[in-house]
A protein has these predicted regions:
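Substrate-binding cleft/loops of secretory-pathway carbohydrate-active enzymes
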Residues: 245-281, 497-536, 577-578
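Aromatic-lined substrate-binding rim segments of carbohydrate-active enzymes
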Residues: 95-97, 110-120, 331-332, 349-394, ...
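Substrate-binding cleft of secreted/luminal carbohydrate-active enzymes
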Residues: 265, 269, 341, 527-545, ...
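Metal-dependent polysaccharide deacetylase catalytic core of the NodB/CE4 family, i.e.
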Residues: 40-48, 54, 98-100, 120-245, ...
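Active-site clefts of carbohydrate-active enzymes
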Residues: 305-315, 499-507, 555-585
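Aromatic-lined carbohydrate-recognition surfaces of secreted/lumenal glycan-active proteins
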Residues: 242, 388-398, 450-454, 474-516, ...
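Catalytic domains of carbohydrate-active enzymes, especially glycoside hydrolases
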Residues: 61-80, 326-352, 443-448, 523-529, ...
Length: 631
């Protein structure tokens, strides 16, 4: 949505027509907290780690680590080995109740001097992930390890690894040979994890080719596995990806080299199946004592609320690089001050405001690139503002530069509202859109997708599709296409979250759902969240607060606990082109929260003009104390 997009949205709402009421479905819970394997990720263990504020955020004190082992034992957790896990995945063994795998990253010397004696005392197995290039490094070599340079004496030796391996308690995983660092990922100079980045060469102005990227990964992983086998007599079965950054290609290469198990840092527990790639780990940070560890393990993350700002990249972009840089700094500063959980960041350019993509903000095969900007802005938001970034893209609305191709692949609609959409039932159109999502993932960092509000099909269009009916055939066809887009992007960005925009009218008047092929119950069953446009002024309501109350009541019919529905407020009355007062927005947020709404967003967020004001935005959209206070 934008100021320029108002006429289109109003026209779409006017065109809503009648159809039969539809029956709700229930979303299955896929991965309940605590129902699976718990994997804990440790790094350095030292005697002198500060209780709070240690320079190494990943270090744990020896005393606290010993207390963790005590607590796990006393509360029914059963440490397992990697070999037990692999056998269980093949159906050759049964894991004990509450299985936990202890992992130690980077191959630091403290694993031998502090951790190993405690593991022997408890008879607990563990997995140690070594960066083979750091083992037995040259005496004069140092590694930038964050808070100070680390040298030879900070990392394990092959002799120490051999002793621990021979004990039967310690198994070894690769942490790559030398990919535990960043490489330049865009023309602006940002550095992102080497394993997932096709490096940008400023000398040539080109990105690493697909073949060169694959060769770099294969050579590195082969060297790491071979060094472990040569020095320890056993080939590693697992790869622990640096920074939890990996993709389908890296996992495939690892498996071809004998490492069918891989770990990341996404999620809290993993059901044990035959596929052991991308196992979730809980990263232990901040030197937690037993209370802190128990807090994290018992916390129900499904109760965490979302606070999201939907951001126009068109407002960040400027043809003048200096002004663009100032715009980006303003955005980062504002988001950091507000403290939301997410930013939904526009990845397409829509300078004419007609709700479709004229160009894209990333390298791609099919549309012009307005600027190679999305990756930079997304990475800056993550690293400087500390938010999760979801890429906001159209589903169907791509205006191809070739007018003949554009016409041939568009939906032939009897409705003349000016909204161009590609016909996703045509193989050529599907392939182009799939390519766009894949190109985004190849070239950019993001953690999820926001599917734009252009994904609709009227009952007068695409007559070859089955009519909507009670089963929601057309709605499901569009959902299936969006999930195919997600799957294509997930080749390069695993475990993507999904959010999809939904107009309010199909929720308030279910008989109108068939006009757009959009249904809340089916959306909530398919996506992590549905971004419901809770925009009373856009809907022409004269009593906005009462309208919001009615919307919440209607949503509860499909989502009784409001787990999956995100209410997206409007900050501008596009009819009058005036901003909604900040106090009124804050009151609306309080009103929705009082009715049990957990997930909130708003649009637009005018970071250039500071509207809504940063103070109002912080009060309404900060997640710093939601739902749990800082410890």
């Amino acid at each position: 949505v934008s100021n320029m997009r108002l006429p289109m949205m109003m026209i779409l709402l006017v065109l809503l027509a009648l159809c039969a009421p539809l029956q709700a479905q229930t979303r299955p819970e896929l991965d309940a907290a605590g129902n699976g394997l718990l994997v804990l990720s440790y790094h350095d263990v030292r005697d002198d780690v500060a209780a709070k504020g240690d320079p190494d955020a990943y270090a744990v004190s020896t005393q606290n680590f010993a207390a963790h082992l005590d607590w796990l034992s006393a509360h029914g957790y059963h440490p397992i080995s990697l070999s037990q896990l692999v056998k269980a995945s093949r159906g050759e063994a049964v894991l004990p109740s509450r299985p936990v795998l202890l992992t130690f990253d980077d191959g630091l010397r403290s694993v031998y001097s502090k951790v190993y004696p405690l593991l022997r005392a408890y008879n607990y197995p563990a997995l140690v992930a070594v960066i083979t290039d750091y083992v037995d490094m040259a005496p004069d070599r140092t590694i930038d390890y964050g808070y100070r340079p680390f040298g030879r004496d900070d990392f394990l030796t092959w002799d120490q690894l051999r002793e621990m391996k021979d004990s039967g308690l310690i198994e070894l995983a690769s942490h790559t040979d030398n990919q535990h660092h960043g490489v330049q990922s865009n023309p602006q100079g940002n550095s992102t994890p080497a394993v997932i980045t096709r490096a940008f060469d400023p000398a040539t102005g080109r990105y690493e080719t697909a073949a060169a990227y694959e060769r770099r990964l294969r050579d590195d992983l082969s060297r790491s596995a071979s060094l472990i086998e040569k020095n320890l007599g056993v080939r590693p079965q697992a790869i622990v990806w640096p920074y939890a950054a990996y993709n389908e290609l890296s996992n495939a290469i690892a498996e071809q080299l004998g490492m069918p198990v891989s770990f990341d840092l996404e999620g809290r527990s993993t059901p044990v199946t035959r596929d052991l790639h991308g196992l979730a780990r809980l990263l232990v940070t901040g030197n937690p004592n037993v209370t802190g560890l128990a807090f994290e393990l018992r916390r129900n993350i499904t109760l965490d609320g979302t606070r999201a700002l939907q951001i126009d990249m068109d407002a960040v972009y400027d043809a003048d690089p200096a002004q663009l840089a100032r715009n980006l700094d303003t955005l980062i500063d504002r988001v950091k001050k507000i403290g939301p959980t997410h930013v939904y960041l526009q990845a397409f350019a829509d300078p004419d405001g007609n709700n479709t993509a004229d160009a894209l903000y990333f390298p791609n095969r099919h549309l012009p690139m307005r600027a190679d900007l999305f990756n930079r802005v997304a990475w800056q938001l993550k690293t400087r503002a500390g938010v999760k970034v979801y890429a906001w893209l159209p589903v169907l609305g791509y205006e191809l530069p070739d007018p003949v191709q554009k016409q041939a692949l568009g939906i032939a609609s009897p409705e003349q509202d000016g909204m161009y959409r590609m016909d996703f039932t045509k193989p050529a159109a599907r392939q182009i859109i799939l390519d766009i999502y894949e190109d985004l993932a190849i070239n950019s960092y993001f953690e999820g997708l926001l599917f734009h509000d252009d994904a609709y099909v009227r009952d007068t269009e695409l007559t070859g599709l089955a009519q909507e009916g009670e089963d929601g055939n057309r709605t499901q066809a569009l959902i299936d296409f969006t999930l195919a887009l997600r799957d294509r992007a997930q080749r390069w960005r695993p475990k993507l979250g999904t959010v999809r925009n939904l107009y309010a009218q199909p929720v308030l008047e279910p008989q109108s759902a068939a006009w757009f092929a959009q249904r809340l119950d089916l959306f909530n069953a398919a996506y992590d969240h549905t971004a419901l446009m809770a925009m009373p002024w856009m809907e022409g309501s004269s009593r906005p607060e009462r309208w919001l109350d009615r919307l919440v009541a209607a949503v509860r019919e499909h989502d009784p606990e409001l787990k999956h529905t995100l209410f997206e407020l409007q900050t501008v009355d596009w009819r009058t082109r005036t901003a909604i007062p900040g106090e009124r927005l804050r009151a609306q947020v309080r009103r929705l929260q009082a009715q049990g709404v957990r997930h909130l967003a708003w649009y637009p967020d005018d970071f250039i003009a500071d509207k809504p004001s940063t103070a109002d935005a912080r009060a309404a959209m900060s997640a710093r104390n939601f739902p749990y206070p800082e410890r």
